Amino acid sequence: MADSETLALQQQAERLRGWRDGFQAVYVITTGVQTGFFDQLAAHPQGLTAEELAQRTACHAPYVAIWCGSAYRYQLLDTVNGRYVLAPHVDSLLVGRAHPDSQAVLFLNAVREAGPRLARQADYMHSGAVGSHAEAYGTNPTRLDPPPNQEALQQRLWQAEMQSRVPALAAALHNGGRVLDVGCGPGLMLLQLAASYPNATFVGVDVVEVGGLETARRLIRERGFDDRIHLECVPAEQMTYAEAFDGVLITRVFHEIPVASRVGLFRACYRALKRPGVLLNLDFAYPDTLAEFREPLFWSGVDNQYREMSWGTVHPTWQEQQQMLTAAGFAAIERHFVRHIPQGTHYLAVANKR
């Protein structure tokens, strides 16, 4: 075997080993979240020994020592004077779930929900069986009781990524405008907008009750927004609103809409908008070309497509989305990449009704 061939083989072998290591790192992180190890280390910035960490979490000391070594190996922990401390930014990313960049819940979901499903992918390949997002949402604790960072993320998405691209909509909201949130789920974007624009009113639609509208109703009632946020359980393509809204939001849900319903959904959104009005659709960036499958901008979409294919997820390409928006009547369609989301890069489509 030529040296170049040996090198190439070893490079590929190292890549595969890295993926195996990453798999184990997911479980090291999840264990640290579930046991409270990260929380305790954040509460003691001077550091803890493995024995002290075991005592404070009522865990088996020899196993905790092994966990600390593994977490140090993955650069989740550092040491100061022989005591373990959190590595930089781990407190924001894995502790105290109010930070918009927190990934603690994503790791929990990966182990509790995605892992078992991915272990059955070979069976799905043979059977072609399809589940549903609604079934999964009804058992997902982050949908039933959303962690604080999810609201913080919605606030940042609006303020940092959306608001500046639709100044006319922002002005309308200040002056008592009206917005429709399609696929509103537990209502987190609605809550943020209602708090930011006290003169505006909002409507949220979804087809998921448990883990969706049921949670939204509770949160809206608790925040005292009952008089300004109305919820409706209806498939979005069956909405009958006509020139009723200044803006329509679809936030990270379009890939879940059945393919046969997508043009109908955009047409219903177009009818629902006043003239002028604007639609904002934020979703995973998915490749148009084979070359884009190897571009990091699109990896979150590629990974999500594989992870959710047995739920019936079909990610649209940008070209497909443009064609659907145009067929629905929208004009001046723009795409903006949004990178600062814990789940990875998304894109924001801005489409206008003129």
Task: Identify the residue ranges that each predicted region occupies.
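Core SAM-dependent methyltransferase catalytic element
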Residues: A328-R354
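C-terminal alpha-helical "lid/dimerization" subdomain adjacent to the S-adenosyl-L-methionine
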Residues: L282-A328, I333-F337
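Conserved SAM-binding loop of SAM-dependent methyltransferases across substrates and taxa
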Residues: P186-P198
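Conserved class I S-adenosyl-L-methionine
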Residues: N175-G185
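A short glycine-rich, Lys/Arg-flanked "PGG" loop and its adjoining helix->strand segment in the class I
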Residues: V263-R275
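A short acidic, Gly/Pro-enriched loop at the edge of an enzyme's catalytic core
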Residues: E237-V248
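Class I SAM-dependent methyltransferase SAM/SAH-binding core
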Residues: A195-A236
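Conserved Class I S-adenosyl-L-methionine-dependent methyltransferase catalytic core
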Residues: W19, F23, T31, S70-G177
